[in-house]
């Protein structure tokens, strides 16, 4: 294998939560008198980081309702819609493939470690990971800071980040590791193609690094 360590983004890369995200944002838009997104294609084309800019793009006026209020409202909707949890296509196969080849696997997330651990348990994939690298166990802000602290501590021989967004590409660049992107998540292939190699799903991505 080309890498000894794989860092996985979670939402949109392993956890298939695109549909609940679309449902949640559309209900939020409707509640605030705004036009709903038409579906997956439009969602993937407008979604991005930071989230506050994404909210502006789709019409929210923070003079009317603050971003913090909207974010709290969205999380409540998301938690309702994101049931039952499901894996992205090819995710389980990818995790198993890497484990069989002795590659150490980690989750890199800006979410709560406890929440992600619970979700991994529910999905039945917790045993694949050496560690969840998140905001609860490393005192740094944002995924770049979290990843940098982990690299300093772990000193991986060779590492790659697999994610589904331009932000994942930026994080990998910031900490000096490679990155592969998948188009099954929150951004489409067209939006990602100028950044990195883009693969259909996690299994396609890991197959590319086994050659």
Label each residue range with its predicted role.
Residues 1, 101-103, 153-157:
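Glycine-rich phosphate-binding loop signature in dinucleotide/nucleotide-binding domains
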Residues 3-92, 101:
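N-terminal helical cap/lid subdomain that shapes the substrate entry/recognition surface
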Residues 25, 91-120, 135:
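Substrate-recognition element of Asp-dependent hydrolases with the DxDx(T/V) motif
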Residues 43, 125-141:
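A short, structured active-site edge motif that brings together acidic residues
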Residues 92-99, 151, 169-173:
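Surface-exposed amphipathic alpha-helices with a cationic face
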Residues 161-200:
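Acidic, Mg2+-coordinating phosphoryl-transfer loop and its flanking beta/alpha structural elements
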